[in-house]
Amino acid sequence: MKYFAIILLLIAQSCQKPIKTENASSYIFTWVKDENDWNSDYIAVINSNPNDRGYGSLVSTLPVGYSDINAHHSEHRFHEIKELFVNGFSGGRSFIVDLNEPENPKLKKTFTNIREYTFPHSFERLPSGNVLATFQTVGQGNNEVGGLVEISPDGDFVRSSNASDPQVAEFIRPYSLAILPEIDRVISTSADMKQKDLSNVVQVWRLSDLSLIKTM
């Protein structure tokens, strides 16, 4: 109920005229699902500068043009290029949002599969500025395990590595990830969003070549 209350508050605020802030230096960017799936999911920009007269107010919104896609994960941190990858998992669709002007956010690109990899889930920005993403599956349906896919800031394929591991019998569906560049590692977790089966593994990868080292 609390989740829906927050969404309802944001929806109510979105009906008001956006407020132009003065001397604002910080914002909260939220990726919001429409409660009833009637209207588009959207990015909401909120003024989080406690010294500004508009503190806590809705600055702007950006509908992405799709409803019933289950606004889900975004990048874990906001990168200096001020763009954000966000995911609508149920629709298998992701979006790149340009937030260089918080009062006027722009939809840069939308994408679904990247080559054979489908149903993107989580995103983590690499030191290079590229994004490393988990994709739950390969192909349509929920039959083949996905993997890690590196994507350029423009949403183009860079490289990939499959998460299947012939050394283990466990059901694998890549879920979230953490990047550890100082030790050349990536850690990914596993959970099946479509709930076909339990998926309780952790995988360790080499960041430099995306090779799978160990499934536990």
Where are these regions (language model features)?
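Residue-level detector of Asp-centered blade-edge/turn motifs that repeat once per structural unit
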Residues: 22-24, 78-81, 125-128, 180-183
